[in-house]
Regions:
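Acidic, polar-rich low-complexity tracts and alpha-helical solenoid repeat scaffolds
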Residues: 1-5, 10, 16-200
């Protein structure tokens, strides 16, 4: 009887270790596919979750799922995936990605107040997403007519590539809304001088 019990315990432990190695290897492969934005990543995510429903990487997997949905402009599905995540289980380096994409998806659903709550978290620590979070936070403030905070955020990114041509338009509109007509004239002339062929 004792020998049988030892055999059973040994079998269970061996199986558990093999299973842990399997889901670990599969997760690393999935992570690589996600980083490369491989076309079959959504199918691999589904297969992984079906095969390993109790994986300790479920939060990371749902993050990948949500990001892919957001990038394909499927914002409701992105929000649904993000809501399955316990952000505390993600690494500190990964949390800005969650908060940025969640905030962005909410912004695209015109839920500006809630979007701000996520975008402002990204600003707390400098990351790849910080300048983009500042711009979209500015946009949320702008849409809710909180022009002073919008101005602060837009000014913080106005000189960054990708925002140099669009931000001045918001600054001009904010100046106009606040009755700063001299600034409107000054910014408009500066914009035309700097970007005469701007399509915005």
């Amino acid at each position: 009887m004792k020998r049988l019990l030892i055999y059973i315990i040994g079998f269970v432990l061996t199986t558990a270790v093999a299973s842990a190695q399997d889901y670990e290897t599969a997760y690393r492969a999935l992570q690589q596919q996600f980083e490369e934005r491989s076309a079959n990543t959504p199918a691999l995510i589904k297969t992984y979750l079906d095969q390993y429903p109790y994986t300790p990487y479920s939060d990371e997997i749902h993050l990948m799922e949500g990001v892919l949905h957001a990038e394909k402009e499927k914002y409701k599905q992105a929000i649904k995936a993000f809501s399955k995540i316990n952000a505390k289980n993600l690494s500190r380096a990964t949390q800005p990605m969650l908060h940025f994409y969640w905030g962005y998806a909410l912004l695209k659903q015109e839920n500006y107040e809630k979007a701000l709550s996520y975008l402002l978290r990204v600003k707390q620590k400098e990351s790849l997403y910080t300048p983009h979070a500042r711009y979209y936070a500015g946009y949320c403030y702008y849409c809710t007519k909180d022009f002073q905070n919008a101005l602060t955020e837009f000014l913080s990114v106005q000189h960054l590539a990708g925002y140099q041509q669009i931000v001045p338009y918001y600054l001009i509109q904010i100046d106009y809304a606040q009755g700063h007509y001299e600034k409107v004239y000054e910014r408009a002339n500066q914009l035309l001088d700097t970007f005469p062929d701007n399509q915005h």
